[in-house]
Amino acid sequence: MSEQKLALNEYLKTDSDYLRGTIKEGLDSSVTGSFSDGDQQLIKFHGFYQQDDRDLRNERKEQKLEPLYSFMLRARVPGGVCTPKQWLGVDEIASTLTSSNSIRLTTRQTFQYHGIPKRNLKTIIQGLDREALDSIAACGDVNRNVMCNPNPVESKLHAQAYEVAKKLSDHLLPHTRAYAEIWLDEEKLLTTEDETVEPVYGKTYLPRKFKMAVAVPPDNDVDVYTNDLGFIAVAENGELVGFNLTAGGGMGSTHGEVETFPRLADDFGFIKTEDVMKFAEAVMTVQRDWGNRTNRKRSRLKYTIVDHGYEKFKAEVEVRAGVKFEPKRDVVIGDRGDRYGWVEGVDGKWHLTLFIESGRIKDMPGKSLQTGMREIAKIHKGDFRMTSNQNMIIAGVAPEDKATIEGLARKRGLLGQVLTQTRGHSIACVALPTCPLAMAEAERYFPEFIDHIDALQAKNGISDQAIVVRMTGCPNGCARPFAAEIGLVGKAPGRYNLYLGANFEGTRLNKMYRENIQEAEILAELDALFARYAIERNAGETFGNFTVRVGVVKAVIDAAKDFHG
C-alpha cells in the first residue's frame, strides 16, 4: 500500500525556507489587500491571520470589489504579564493603526488587534518590537502563547511559576530569522545547507498547533486540562518544587465528523522543576515525529496519544527526557474564575481584577474602557496581567495608590457594573464578522444571551450559583466551550449546539444535549433544567454535576468513545 499523501501545509512548510515563503513580496504588492494562498498559511507563524469583513462581503461582491481584507494580529505575552509602558505602546497602535480601534484580550492571556490593513502590518510589528513585544509563534504549527495562572494572592509562588512559563516560551520559540528579516529589516544571515536552523522543530515544524499552560492550584483559570501540555505547580512550604505534568488536551473538533472530538489531558506524573524543559521538549518532539501529517483534522497531540496509546507515548517521552515520571502529587484543582475587585497579596501590594466583557477594550457610549486603561497605565507603578478569562488585573498597587486607581476605573466604566456569578465565569470567542470560520455569532451576541441566563437564574432562585457558560461561533473551540457547564457552539446563523455536563473545575468534558437549536429553544430547555436544579440539587452540587447525576446527559469519561456516543 502506498504512503498517504501529506497535508498541503506540510509541503508549504517544507518549501518555505523556514517560514519566509513569498511573504515579503506579498507585503510589497499594492495590487491586492491579501496574501497568496500559501503565504496565508505561513503568516500565521508570524502571528497573524488574514480575514475580511463578512458583514460587507455581499455588498462588495455586487460592487465587483475584492473582499475588504484585513488582518488579526496576536501578540506573544507569556503568562499575560506586561508593563504599563508596554500597554501604552499597545494602546497607541490600536488607536492609530487598526480600523477596530480596540484591543481584544484573548482566552490565552494575550491581546490581539483586529482590522489591520496589510500596509500597516510592518509598522505594527516594529511598534511592538520597540516595546520588547512580538507576535512570533502566536499562531501556526508551533508552541503558542504559554499561559500561567496570575494568582494575585500567592505572589511568590506566582512569580516562580511565571518564570517557568516564560522560560518555556523562550526555549520553544522558532529559531528561524524570517520574522526579524521580513518585519524588522534585519539582514539575512548566510547559512550552510547542513546547518540546523530549527533544533527542536525541524524543517516542517509541528503537525498542528501546540498549546501549553502552567497552573497554580487551587486555581484552574488557565483550564490546564484543555491544553496539549500542562504543568500543575506543586509547592512545599510555599516554595515551588515541581509539577504534575498533563498532556493530550485540546478543544477543536468538526461538526459531523465523529473521528474528531475535544479531549482533556491525561495525568502523566510528577516532575522536578529542573526537568521541565527536558519534558517539554520531549513531549513536543514525540508529537513532531509521531503526529499525523496527512490529515490536519487528526493532527493534534490528543489524537497522537489516542492512536499510539498512553503507555507507549509515556515511555517514549521518558526516553527522550532521560528522566522517569514520579507518581503524581496530590493537588486540589478548583475554581476557573477570576477574583474580581481588590485582593491583597502576601507582599502587602494590592491587585484589582477588572471584568472585561468578552475581552474587548474599547471606548463605547457610557464606558470608556480604552481611555480608562490608558489613564491607569500612565500612573500605575506595578504591572498588568491579562487572564485567560479575558479580564485584566491591575497588579502590584501600593496601598496609598488604591483610591486613585479605583477612581479612574470607576470613572471610565471599568468598575461598578453589576456582575452576576455566572457572567463572571463566562467567556466567548470573537466569531462574526471577522473570523472566517464562524458559523454563528458569539462575542456580539453573548452579553445579551447572558442577560437571559441571569434572568432565568433569578426566576428560579439560583442566582447565587456560578455556572460556567461559554459560546463559540464554530467547533474549533477557542473559548473552550466543551469544558463549560453550558456550552454553545455555532452551527448556523442564529443556531447552536447545546452542550451540558462538564464540571465546574474543568476536569470533565460536556456532551451534546440538543443540536442546531435557536435562542427560544435554548432558553426553554435551560429554564426547565434550572427549575429542576433549584428543587432537586444536593447541597453544594454544581449545575454540571447535577445534569450528569440526574441523567440529563451521560458523563464523558473517555472522549474518544463517549463524546459522540
UniProtKB/Swiss-Prot annotation:
Residues noted as binding siroheme in the record, renumbered to the chain: C478
BP-aspect Gene Ontology terms: cysteine biosynthetic process; hydrogen sulfide biosynthetic process; sulfate assimilation
Catalytically driven reaction(s): hydrogen sulfide + 3 NADP(+) + 3 H2O = sulfite + 3 NADPH + 4 H(+)
Pathway(s) of this molecule: Sulfur metabolism; hydrogen sulfide biosynthesis; hydrogen sulfide from sulfite (NADPH route): step 1/1
GO cellular component: sulfite reductase complex (NADPH)
Residue numbers binding [4Fe-4S] cluster: C429, C435, C474, C478
Cofactor: siroheme; [4Fe-4S] cluster
Residues spanning the membrane: none
Cofactor binding summary note: Binds 1 siroheme per subunit.
GO terms, molecular function: 4 iron, 4 sulfur cluster binding; heme binding; metal ion binding; NADP binding; sulfite reductase (NADPH) activity
Protein task: Component of the sulfite reductase complex that catalyzes the 6-electron reduction of sulfite to sulfide. This is one of several activities required for the biosynthesis of L-cysteine from sulfate.
Family: Belongs to the nitrite and sulfite reductase 4Fe-4S domain family.
Subunit record text: Alpha(8)-beta(8). The alpha component is a flavoprotein, the beta component is a hemoprotein.
Designated name of the protein: Sulfite reductase [NADPH] hemoprotein beta-component
The species this protein was found in: Shewanella oneidensis (strain ATCC 700550 / JCM 31522 / CIP 106686 / LMG 19005 / NCIMB 14063 / MR-1)
